[in-house]
C-alpha cells in the first residue's frame, strides 16, 4: 500500500466526494448564518439532532432565492459536495434552497406580508374611504382585455355619468410590475387637480398563479400604499387572494365586481328618489295640514285678542269718561255748594235787608215830605254831590253836582267858587 501525503489524500477525497455527491438534496435547520455585505455570499451550517454540515450560497444563486434565508429555518438545499484541500474541509455548494414542507414562493410571500404588516400597510386606519358618487375613475388594465370591456359595459349601465379612463398597462409577464407601478403613479399624479380621479382600479381577469403572482410584488404594494387616491384591487377570481388585495383601500373579487362595488346603481337611486319624493310629498301634506290648523288657531286667537283689545280700549275710554264725569259732577256739586252757601247767606241776612229797606222807604217818604214842606225860592233847587246834600260853601272847583226840585233834576260841574 502506497503512503500518501496529507495533500494527496485530501485531493483524492475531494475528487471522490465531488464525483459521488455531484447533486444532493439535504434537509436540516439553518444555523450560524452569515451574509457578507460586500461579496453577497451567504455562509451557514445545516444541522439535525446528531450532525452538522457547512454550506455556502454564492451571490448569483442567492439573488435567485425567492425568500429571505433566516436562522432556525427548516430548509431543503439542492447542491453538490465540494472540498477544500488545504484544510481538508468539505461543504455543500448550494444551487437552490426551498423551505421545508412549503414552497419558497409561499414562504417569501408570508415573509413579505409580515414585513408590510409591521409597516402598517394593512391597517384599516390607513385606508381611504370609498367615494359615494365617482365622476372620474382610472382603470389600470390592458385596453384590449375582456376585463376592460366588461367594466365599461357595467359602468355604462350602472352609473353612466362616470367617466371611465383606461390606463393601458402590462398585466402579466416580464415588465408587468414596473408597468403597473408606473401606471398607479401616473393616475395618482392628478390628485388635487381639476382632472383628479376619484378612484384607481387595478384590474385583470383570471389566470394561472404564475400570471397573477406579479401582484404579490412589494413594489406594487408600495405604489398602492403611497397613493393619495382611493384604490381598488380587482385581480383574478373570487378564489384568488393577492398581496395587492390586502394593501389596496378596497378589494373586489373580479373586475366586474369592482364596478358593482365602486359605482352606485342609477336604477336603485331613481327608485330611492321616487321614494324620497313620495315621503317628501306626504311629509309636506302633513306639515301643510299642521300649519294650516295652526294658522287657523292663530287667526281665531287674533280675532279674540282683537275683540278683547277693543273691549279693553273701550273700557279705558269708559273709565276716562267715568273719571271725567265724576270730576264734572264734583265740580258741579262744588259750584252748587258755593251757590247754596251764597243763597243760604242771603237767606240768613234777608230780615236785616228787609228792615233796612223799610227804614229807607220811611226816610224816602220823610224826605219827600220835607221837600213838600220846604219853601224854596222861585226857580230854586237842592244841591247834592254823590247823592248827598252839600252846602255851597263846601263846593270847590271841579266838583260834579246835581240840582233838583220837584219838577226836574240836572247835573253840573263847578267852575269856580266865590266866597261872599
From Swiss-Prot:
Any single biological process term in GO: DNA catabolic process
Swiss-Prot/TrEMBL keywords: Cytoplasm, Exonuclease, Hydrolase, Nuclease
Cell location: Cytoplasm
EC number of the protein: 3.1.11.6
Reaction(s) catalysed (UniProt annotation): Exonucleolytic cleavage in either 5'- to 3'- or 3'- to 5'-direction to yield nucleoside 5'-phosphates
GO molecular function annotations of the record: exodeoxyribonuclease VII activity; nucleic acid binding
Quaternary assembly: Heterooligomer composed of large and small subunits.
PANTHER family cross-referenced by the UniProt entry: EXODEOXYRIBONUCLEASE 7 LARGE SUBUNIT
Function: Bidirectionally degrades single-stranded DNA into large acid-insoluble oligonucleotides, which are then degraded further into small acid-soluble oligonucleotides.
Name of the protein described by the UniProt record: Exodeoxyribonuclease 7 large subunit
